[in-house]
UniProtKB/Swiss-Prot annotation:
Notes on the domains: Consists of three main regions, an N-terminal coiled-coil domain that binds to protein Pup and functions as a docking station, an interdomain involved in ARC hexamerization, and a C-terminal ATPase domain of the AAA type.
Gene encoding the protein: arc
Signal sequence interval, chain numbering: none
Annotated Gene Ontology cellular component terms: proteasome complex
Chain's role: ATPase which is responsible for recognizing, binding, unfolding and translocation of pupylated proteins into the bacterial 20S proteasome core particle. May be essential for opening the gate of the 20S proteasome via an interaction with its C-terminus, thereby allowing substrate entry and access to the site of proteolysis. Thus, the C-termini of the proteasomal ATPase may function like a 'key in a lock' to induce gate opening and therefore regulate proteolysis.
Protein name: Proteasome-associated ATPase
Species: Renibacterium salmoninarum (strain ATCC 33209 / DSM 20767 / JCM 11484 / NBRC 15589 / NCIMB 2235)
Coiled-coil residues: 18-71
Length: 594
């Protein structure tokens, strides 16, 4: 009994140990199952996400295909041109109560209870309704509109960008124009809403739609616009050197009649219609013409007490006016003067400048291969003193062959004032040099020290030395020897062929030499040596330039008139380190000057 009681605790402990092992094994099994369930749940979640994405993509694709099928079944939209707008108007409403745009485009005398528009569609003119989503105020005549299958306007589009090019011949009221098209066919077109807000002039090129009868767009005519420069030049008389007497003569002829018209009327005087500036090339004819326009604007502003008065300078590129088609050059001349009259209609001064006038208006009957001058010259004459007056318009012509211009243009009453722009003498050359060589330029320190560090004294001395070298008559400056028909001969020097353009080129050369010295030696500033070297190089460069094939023509262009020249000997001076000077003989040849 005692032994059995002693073994009982041992059996209980063994039994409990077995139960713990069983529970531990069951726990491990359940934990493994839980892990498997978590993995299965994660895989299911991932598959569910993929399934959701796939379903959404399929739904979007189904909607896209459905929309495409619906569009494929829609009726096509049509395009039409808007001809007229008919706003809503009651029977008792007067036309005057409508806006200006509605009065111009609405059907007068009819009661319009619903908003509608007239369109040009497939060769027919139709009146159609508008969608409630279309604002009638946003539409304008000539505009393209979009029509649905029931021919209702559902949208307003832009203006057609293509069409037939026509030229405006005459304006009819404010909304129509008489135009010429192909083969000079004339027709009346309406101006579209886009053109109604622009200023249309005679001669303008328009793009027109022949189906609707509307002019849609203004097209720049580059072949005409490029010939005319309407900018007001910023060149004044102070920018021109060596032409004091000529400038005074021009100011008396141009500015006095424009600034004091009452005095001229009181004395029975008329303002000159034109000025001819003639002389050798490069002496300032174009500069003077630009200064005239600038001065007229400044004087008019002073007279009227204004800060600024507009003036216009129409610079006509003479040779580019010529056209191979008969009548085109005359048309361009008419357009130029129509533009000038338009600009001058408000009292502004307009200068019409014909450069190289001899290329356009040659003496009639002198043409070798053509006779275009027989119609171009009369066209200019009719514009200058024709039926239409040229008030506030001044014609200025420039030429270095005034002998080739038709005498009818040069007579009094047309080009009244004739101003000869001569080659500059030594005093005029110094004045021109002073316009380009100023105290603002960097001057070399050695030259400044030689004149007491005075920039003005240095510049004056530099100009004086340069002019003396340019106008010396020693052997180094001999240029040409001419022989006249009477047997006399004359030596011409470099100074006899000097011009303002040559002087400017000399200064530019000197500046370039100063820059090269600064880059190579580090010495900064312009020196007298640079100016003298520039004069010598300019002279040497022009030794082979004079074309003396025809001595008479060469003499006219070079401003050597008088006794007929029969023989020219070109003198070539040797450069430093090269062979000494020599002469080239030129025999008489009747060829043209080219």
């Amino acid at each position: 009994m005692t032994e059995t009681s002693a073994n009982k605790p041992e059996n209980t402990q063994a039994h409990e140990g077995r139960d713990y092992s069983v529970l531990e094994r069951q726990f491990n099994v359940l934990r493994d199952k839980l892990r498997n369930v978590d993995r299965q749940l994660a895989a299911a979640t991932q598959n569910n996400t993929k399934m959701t994405t796939t379903l959404q993509s399929a739904k979007a694709e189904i909607l896209r295909l459905k929309s495409a099928l619906e569009k494929d079944g829609q009726a096509p939209y049509s395009f039409a041109t808007l001809v007229q707008i008919n706003p809503r108007r009651t029977p008792g409403q007067a036309v005057s109560t409508l806006s200006a745009a509605d009065q111009a485009s609405s059907a007068t005398g009819l009661a319009v209870t619903e908003e509608s528009v007239d369109i040009a569609y497939q060769g027919r003119k139709m009146r159609v309704g508008l969608s409630p989503l279309v604002n009638i105020a946003s539409l304008s005549p000539g505009q393209e509109v979009l029509l649905n299958e029931s021919l209702t306007v559902i949208a307003g589009l832009g203006f057609e960008r293509t069409g037939e090019i026509v030229s405006v011949k005459e304006l009819i009221g404010t909304d129509r124009a008489l135009v010429t098209g192909r083969a000079d066919e004339e027709r009346v077109v309406k101006l579209s809403g886009a053109l109604m807000s622009q200023k249309i002039r005679v001669g303008d090129a328009l793009s027109a739609d022949s189906r609707s009868g509307y002019a849609l767009e203004k097209v720049p005519r580059s072949e005409v616009e490029n010939l005319i420069l309407e900018e007001v030049p910023d060149i004044s008389y102070h920018d021109i050197g060596g032409l004091g007497p000529q400038i005074e003569q021009i100011r008396d002829a141009v500015e006095l009649p424009f600034l004091h018209p009452d005095l001229y009327r009181e004395h029975g005087l008329k303002a000159p219609k034109g000025i001819l500036l003639y002389g050798p090339p490069g002496c300032g004819k174009t500069l003077i013409a630009k200064a005239v326009a600038n001065s007229l604007a400044a004087r008019a502003a002073e007279r009227n007490g204004l800060k600024e008065t507009k003036s216009f300078f129409l610079n006509i590129k003479g040779p580019e006016l010529l056209d191979k088609y008969v009548g085109e050059t005359e048309r361009k001349i008419r357009l130029i003067f129509a533009r000038a009259r338009e600009k001058a209609s408000d009292g502004s001064a307009v200068v019409v400048f014909f450069d190289e006038m001899d290329s356009l208006f040659r003496t009639r009957g002198t043409g070798v291969s053509s006779d275009v001058e027989t119609t171009i010259v009369p066209q200019l004459l009719s514009e200058i003193d024709g039926v239409e007056r040229l008030d506030n318009v001044i014609v200025i012509g420039a030429s270095n062959r005034e002998d080739m211009i038709d005498p009818a243009i040069l007579r009094p009453g047309r080009l009244d004032v004739k101003v000869k722009i001569q080659r500059p003498d030594a005093e005029a050359a110094a004045d021109i040099f002073a316009k380009y060589v100023t105290v603002d330029l960097p001057l070399h320190q050695d030259d400044l020290l030689a004149h007491g560090n005075s920039a003005q004294a240095t510049v004056d001395a530099m100009i004086q030395r340069t002019v003396e070298a340019m106008y010396s008559t020693d052997k180094s400056n001999e240029y040409l020897e001419v022989t006249y028909a009477n047997g006399d001969s004359e030596m011409l020097y470099f100074k006899d062929f000097n011009s303002g353009a040559v002087i400017q080129n000399v200064v530019d050369r000197a500046k370039k030499y100063a820059i090269k010295d600064l880059l190579t030696t580090g010495d900064k500033g312009i020196r007298v040596d640079h100016m003298l070297r520039a004069v010598a190089d300019e002279f040497r460069e022009h030794e082979d330039m004079p074309n003396t094939t025809n001595p008479d023509d060469w003499a006219r262009i070079s401003d050597k008139k008088g006794e007929r020249i029969t023989y020219i000997r070109t003198i070539i001076q040797g450069k430093a380190g090269q062979e000494p000077g020599k002469t080239l003989e030129t025999s008489l040849n009747t060829g043209q000057y080219l």
